[in-house]
């Protein structure tokens, strides 16, 4: 626990006193010894400009009894080294988020960081609270029932869904989401019919969310109410620096695009694995989530979601669910990539065409604001 005093460069530690509303914030730019702490007493009329008068023994006792140490590694959230940390949280200095009017509690420190590279030196900061707020607008004539948990949104079909044979069915979820800056959503689906596959989708800020259903059988499918379930999990996103990426184009709204470097063909009802000359060298805690692109899904190609780790070359597993050979030209987007510190796994599905992605971040918490809408 005491090793939190010596951290890497440009990481921040927030020390919170449980018995009062006073917080101590500081950046650690070098290894700090406990004996080198300032000895200036902190009085009641001062706020966050000085450190408490402690020595090594009293400081350890203070950590064990009255203090909770919380470490937020800046590289995980894409905060630049000149990131801003608020030193006061008085009401006259409140800032509003884009999604809701966030009412801060007095004395609660809030960390601001930009999400996109274009905003890193911008004047407007983005407020990230302990429980990010997500606005959910559900259309009244929706075909989906919406259930909100502490960390995700679940949608279950309440009407019949017709999936034609040898076609890709695009299903509108009839919900709109306003996701706070710095986060994204990942949609994973499951169907009770083994011949119906749900394509994984990522969303950043969508007002017209739709998913793809693929029929792998030789006849049309009729999905009964309750046969299809979609889960929307929300995770923090990260934009690596340009020197951390190899053979990847700049992102669009925090999403990178993996394009085919050479042409290839996908034979009918068969698998093919394509390798790409790309790599990244970010922090160990980061991983890249590779989601099939919409252009590929519309062709009837089923791509298995890939969890791309650092210092490795990505490989994409493609299944041609159609009865014809599909030609993939050079330059077409195969997959979309987003970087996050979330935790995932691929569940082995022997009876399915591809394995299923599962999000393991069950301890995260979000504040959902639900609103019913009359718009179709």
Curated annotation (Swiss-Prot):
Signal peptide: none annotated. This is Deoxyuridine 5'-triphosphate nucleotidohydrolase. It comes from Human herpesvirus 6A (strain Uganda-1102) (HHV-6 variant A). It catalyses: dUTP + H2O = dUMP + diphosphate + H(+). One of its GO terms (molecular function) is metal ion binding. Involved in nucleotide metabolism: produces dUMP, the immediate precursor of thymidine nucleotides and decreases the intracellular concentration of dUTP to avoid uracil incorporation into viral DNA. Pfam families: dUTPase. Disulfide bonds: none annotated. Belongs to the dUTPase family. It comes from the Viruses. One of its GO terms (biological process) is dUTP metabolic process. Its EC number is 3.6.1.23. Coiled coil: none annotated. Keywords: Hydrolase, Magnesium, Metal-binding, Nucleotide metabolism. Its cofactor is Mg(2+).
């Amino acid at each position: 626990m005491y090793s939190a005093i010596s951290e890497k460069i440009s990481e921040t530690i927030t020390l919170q006193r449980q018995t009062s509303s006073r917080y101590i914030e500081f950046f650690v730019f070098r290894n700090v010894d406990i004996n080198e702490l300032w000895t200036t007493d902190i009085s009641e009329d001062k706020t966050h400009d000085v450190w408490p008068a402690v020595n090594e023994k009293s400081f350890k006792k203070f950590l064990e009894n009255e203090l909770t140490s919380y470490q937020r590694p800046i590289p995980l959230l894409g905060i630049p080294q000149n990131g801003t940390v608020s030193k006061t949280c008085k009401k006259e200095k409140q800032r509003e988020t884009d999604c809701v009017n966030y009412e801060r509690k007095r004395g609660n420190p809030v960390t601001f960081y930009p999400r996109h590279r274009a905003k890193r030196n911008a004047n407007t900061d983005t407020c990230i609270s302990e429980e990010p707020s997500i606005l959910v607008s559900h259309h009244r004539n929706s075909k989906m029932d919406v259930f909100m948990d502490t960390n995700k949104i679940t949608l279950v079909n309440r009407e019949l869904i017709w999936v034609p044979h040898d076609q890709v069915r695009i299903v509108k979820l009839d919900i709109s989401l306003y996701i706070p800056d710095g986060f994204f959503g990942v949609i994973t689906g499951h169907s009770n019919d083994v011949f119906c596959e749900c394509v994984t989708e990522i969303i950043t800020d969508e007002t017209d969310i739709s998913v793809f259903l693929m029929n792998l059988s030789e006849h049309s499918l009729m999905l009964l109410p309750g046969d299809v379930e979609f889960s929307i999990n929300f995770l923090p996103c990260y934009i690596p620096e340009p020197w951390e990426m190899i053979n990847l184009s700049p992102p669009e709204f925090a999403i990178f695009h993996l394009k085919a470097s050479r042409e290839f063909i996908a034979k009918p009802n068969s698998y093919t694995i394509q390798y790409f000359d790309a790599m990244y060298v970010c922090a160990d805690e980061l991983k890249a989530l590779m989601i099939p692109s919409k252009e590929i899904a519309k062709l009837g190609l089923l791509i298995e979601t890939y969890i791309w780790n650092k210092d490795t070359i990505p490989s994409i597993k493609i299944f041609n669910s159609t009865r014809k050979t599909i030609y993939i030209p050079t330059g077409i987007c195969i997959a979309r990539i987003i970087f996050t510190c979330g935790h995932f796994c691929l569940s082995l599905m022997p009876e399915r065409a591809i394995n299923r992605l599962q999000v393991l971040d069950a301890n995260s918490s979000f504040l959902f604001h639900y609103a019913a809408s009359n718009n179709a």
